[in-house]
């Protein structure tokens, strides 16, 4: 499709969901409670797991964290990548002790939607050269 700016958006441009999908993506990417840097690190981590070539093209995770809160967020993603939704109770407690409820919700929503986008890109065999 010619609708959209990126190759990913152009694939979705064939469907009526493009606008809503893109709005959700833009809203979740905006910095609200979590920094843009930690969100980008999470995106890069998930891209390696999801085998989306298009998503992986932006680079590997950097492994650089600004503060303890960001380290906890990244640690959660590492656990999530290994066990999926079976996050141990201790990890959830650590999140609750160090992040606000709003930060936890934003973190989980960002992880979930980013994971979904990248799996879609992998299923569609989207490549950076497309």
Regions found by a protein language model. Give the residues of each.
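Hydrophobic alpha-helical segments
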Residues: 1-130
